[in-house]
């Protein structure tokens, strides 16, 4: 029925609009929203496809157009890929799949992704601004990005780098300096529309400590780039990754995500995982 007979409910849609409009209006009073907006605008240079939805946009929602778009997207199941994982009897499942999926509409439409040119800013960009808050704090966001081949080795190395920096910043920023409750470090490798890697570092601190902590953040980035990680930190991360991978292999959700990854990007996130982790310098 999701494909063939989506149910129109004008009352539910009106309720959805009212709830979201009220929530978005309340968000505007949160200083953190201004920070998030500034981060997005700085990275994506005010690209309209990265604009945050605001309360006034809710009134412009066209239910008829939404349903029309939905029906267009789901009128052709031929270009869909359905993935089933779990402890099932394959032979018993096949006729059920044939019955239910075989009855879905199909017009043999072939599609691919479109590059909407939502590119990240290149070069050095810095934006500082002040907003009045009940409790003074400095929110900090650092983003590094660049071209990077999309493969399992680079994905693992980026994950290792993120985790090692997390250990370093926990020791030097949180424990030694007492400057923050924690530093978030996250890395991401993407294939579409361009092969890119990004590393983001986020933390909050007292305004008086911001400058010193930022110096530590960049000094440790420079140190790991030039000298590499300590043997102790590297071994901790390797041990954790191997243990978690062994646990993940028992989960249906992990296999589902891995199959989806392979179909979408061609990268097999399971094959050679352990060998790459143990071999990484």
List PLM regions with ranges.
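Flexible helix-coil linker/hinge segments at domain or subdomain boundaries
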Residues: 9, 107-112, 227-234
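Glycine-centered hinge/linker elements that transmit conformational signals in sensory
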Residues: 96-110
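Short, charged, amphipathic alpha-helices and their helix-cap/turn boundaries
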Residues: 58-64
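Short beta-strand/turn micro-motifs at beta-sheet edges
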Residues: 68-71, 127-131, 185-191
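Non-catalytic, conformational "gating/processing" segments within enzyme and secreted inhibitor domains
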Residues: 13, 64-100
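His/Glu-based metal-binding/catalytic segments typifying zinc-dependent metallopeptidases
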Residues: 109-168, 172
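Peptidyl-prolyl cis-trans isomerase
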Residues: 7-8, 12-13, 61
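M16 family metallopeptidases and their MPP-like homologs
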Residues: 1-3, 17-25, 30-58, 78-85, ...
């Amino acid at each position: 029925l999701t494909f063939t007979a989506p149910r129109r409910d004008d009352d539910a849609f009106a309720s959805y609009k009212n709830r979201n409009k009220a929530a978005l209006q309340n968000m505007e009073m949160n200083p953190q929203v201004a920070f998030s907006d500034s981060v997005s605008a700085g990275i994506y240079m005010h690209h309209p496809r990265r604009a945050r939805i605001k309360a006034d946009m809710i009134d412009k929602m066209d239910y008829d157009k939404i349903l029309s778009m939905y029906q267009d997207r789901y009128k052709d199941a031929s270009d869909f890929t359905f993935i089933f994982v779990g402890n099932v009897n394959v032979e018993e499942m096949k006729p059920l799949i044939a019955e239910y999926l075989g009855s879905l509409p199909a017009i043999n439409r072939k599609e691919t992704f479109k590059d909407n040119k939502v590119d990240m800013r290149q070069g050095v960009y810095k934006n500082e601004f002040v907003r009045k808050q009940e409790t003074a704090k400095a929110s900090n966001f650092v983003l590094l990005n660049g071209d990077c081949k999309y493969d399992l080795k680079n994905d693992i190395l980026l994950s290792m780098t993120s985790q090692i920096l997390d250990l370093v910043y926990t020791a030097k920023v949180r424990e030694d300096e007492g400057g923050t409750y924690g530093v978030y470090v996250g890395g991401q490798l993407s294939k579409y529309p361009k092969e890119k890697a990004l590393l983001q570092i986020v933390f909050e601190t007292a305004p008086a400590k911001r400058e010193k902590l930022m110096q530590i953040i960049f000094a440790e980035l420079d140190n790991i780039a030039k000298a590499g990680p300590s043997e102790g930190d590297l071994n901790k991360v390797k041990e954790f990754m191997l243990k978690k991978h062994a646990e993940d292999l028992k989960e249906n959700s992990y296999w589902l995500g891995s199959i989806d990854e392979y179909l979408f990007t061609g990268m097999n996130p399971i094959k050679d995982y352990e060998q790459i982790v143990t071999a990484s310098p």
